[in-house]
Amino acid sequence: NVDELIILDISRERKYDINREDLNYQNLDSILAIFKDFSRKSFMPLTLGGGVKTLSDIEDRLRAGADKVAINSAAIHQPDFLEKAAGRFGSQALVASIDALELGTDCWEVFTDFGKTATGLNPLNAAQRLESAGAGEILVNSINRDGQCQGFDMPLISAVTESVDVPVIGLGGGGTTQHFVECFENTKVSALAASNIFQYTEQAVFNLNHELNTLGINIRPAAISNMETF
């Protein structure tokens, strides 16, 4: 019942070997190996991101099974890189990711490099620039609300969606059904993404999907199907 899965590699040391040598466990020591193993078992659209700095990084992730590749810091700091990527792989394969920190009422700044580097950019201007450079979608994340489950930053999401023509995915703060309903009803966002609600709430995917449909939100209906255990 998930429409799409976004995997963002936010590890800093790039060490993936967990030193587990069980008989029935294949140890995976690189992010590409993890991606390949995951995509082999996944039957939904898959977006992979994190650590993307070169055209080869994009190609590697697409070859690993990604339908789309999310790019954050490299896209913000090097618009020409995104242009080259769009020319080679097509805009439909590229998601530009924006991490925005709220500085005051209706005032945000784009940060990169794990939220450490201030860019001086407004997320609206950044989104427009990324769209012009060739991004097929924009993923906008609220740093302030990330992991808080206190609701989406609707002013931020609304401002970004109004500034571009490409689809916008909102991220950061989704913790209850009402948070999703409010954001869908009060913004023009194309999709909403979340993590904690799905990781720590029993049957969250099915229940959220069902509740949104019941409340009239236009999304694909939930369905129960046979599931294979991997």
List PLM regions with ranges.
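Conserved, mostly hydrophobic/aromatic
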Residues: 5, 61, 96, 130, ...
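Hydrophobic faces of well-ordered beta-strands that scaffold small-molecule active sites
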Residues: 5-7, 46-50, 69-71, 94-98, ...
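Glycine-rich, proline-tolerant flexible connector loops at the mouths of alpha/beta enzymes
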Residues: 4-30, 73, 139-150
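Glycine-rich phosphate-binding active-site loops on the catalytic face of alpha/beta enzymes
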Residues: 12, 60-81, 142-147, 170-206
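Conserved anion-binding
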Residues: 62, 66-140, 144-145
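Glycine/small-residue-rich loop that forms an oxyanion/phosphate-binding "nest" at active or ligand-binding sites
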Residues: 19-89
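Charged helix-capping and loop-helix junction motifs
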Residues: 21-34, 119-124, 150-158
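Catalytic cores of alpha/beta
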Residues: 37-65, 155-192
